């Protein structure tokens, strides 16, 4: 019988526990390495879940039932926002 996969929130809580434990500084080296590796694994799994959720939310349906694809906003300095102010900008009034 397969066990249920932990939820995003459960994995995040587990990662937070690992970080808190390692930050205490009194963890034996072998245990610290094992926990660090587990933390990296959890971090990658959480990032994958976030990426998948972002892709899912990137496809929204408008009022007419048509799919609208929204591009991910980045911190890219080459996109200074000129003419592309995004949802809720003052230009939409």
UniProtKB/Swiss-Prot annotation:
The keyword Transmembrane does not apply. Keywords: Cytoplasm, Exonuclease, Hydrolase, Nuclease. Its EC number is 3.1.11.6. GO terms for biological process: DNA catabolic process. One of its GO terms (molecular function) is exodeoxyribonuclease VII activity. It catalyses: Exonucleolytic cleavage in either 5'- to 3'- or 3'- to 5'-direction to yield nucleoside 5'-phosphates. It is an enzyme of class 3 (hydrolase). It comes from the Bacteria. InterPro entries: Exonuc_VII_S, Exonuc_VII_ssu_sf. GO terms for cellular component: cytosol; exodeoxyribonuclease VII complex. It is found in: Cytoplasm. Pfam families: Exonuc_VII_S (PF02609). SUPFAM superfamilies: XseB-like. Residues 61-75 have a biased composition (Basic and acidic residues). Residues 61-93 are annotated as: Disordered. Its main location: cytoplasm. Belongs to the XseB family. HAMAP family: Exonuc_7_S. Heterooligomer composed of large and small subunits. Bidirectionally degrades single-stranded DNA into large acid-insoluble oligonucleotides, which are then degraded further into small acid-soluble oligonucleotides. NCBIfam families: PRK00977.1-2, xseB. This is Exodeoxyribonuclease 7 small subunit. It comes from Limosilactobacillus reuteri (strain DSM 20016).
